[in-house]
Swiss-Prot record:
Listed name of the protein: Small ribosomal subunit protein bS6
One Gene Ontology term, aspect cellular component: ribonucleoprotein complex
Organism: Aster yellows witches'-broom phytoplasma (strain AYWB)
Keyword Secreted assigned: no
Lineage: Bacteria, Bacillati, Mycoplasmatota, Mollicutes, Acholeplasmatales
Any Gene Ontology biological process: translation
Gene encoding the protein: rpsF
Length: 95
C-alpha cells in the first residue's frame, strides 16, 4: 500500500448537507480495509485563482490516505462521474 495526497474542489453553490454527503461518499472508498485515511481537512469555501466552469469559488477538501491501487482507481472513477466536483488531483507520496 502506498500513501497518497488528494485534493478536490466542489462547486460553490452546494448546500452543506450535500457537501457532507459527497465528502462521506469519497472518504468511504478509503475506509474499507486495508485502506485508511491518515489525515483529512475540509478547508471550506475559497476563491479560485481563475474561473473553473464559470465558478470563481469552490469548496476545497484535502485527504492523506494509505491505500491500494484499487481504492485509488475507484476514487478516480467516482470523481469523474460526479458533476459537483470541478477539479481534483491525486499525488503519490515518495514513501
Amino acid at each position: 500500500m502506498k500513501k497518497y495526497e488528494i485534493m478536490y474542489i466542489l462547486r460553490p453553490n452546494l448546500d452543506n448537507k450535500y457537501v457532507k454527503k459527497i465528502n462521506d461518499t469519497l472518504q468511504n472508498v478509503f475506509l474499507q480495509a486495508p485502506n485508511q485515511i491518515l489525515e483529512q481537512k475540509e478547508i471550506g469555501l475559497k476563491d479560485l485563482t481563475y474561473f473553473i466552469d464559470n465558478h470563481k469559488k469552490g469548496y476545497y477538501n484535502w485527504l492523506m490516505v494509505k491505500a491500494d491501487n484499487d481504492a485509488v482507481l475507484e476514487f478516480n472513477r467516482i470523481v469523474k462521474i460526479t458533476e459537483e466536483i470541478i477539479r481534483f488531483i491525486v499525488i503519490k507520496d515518495k514513501e
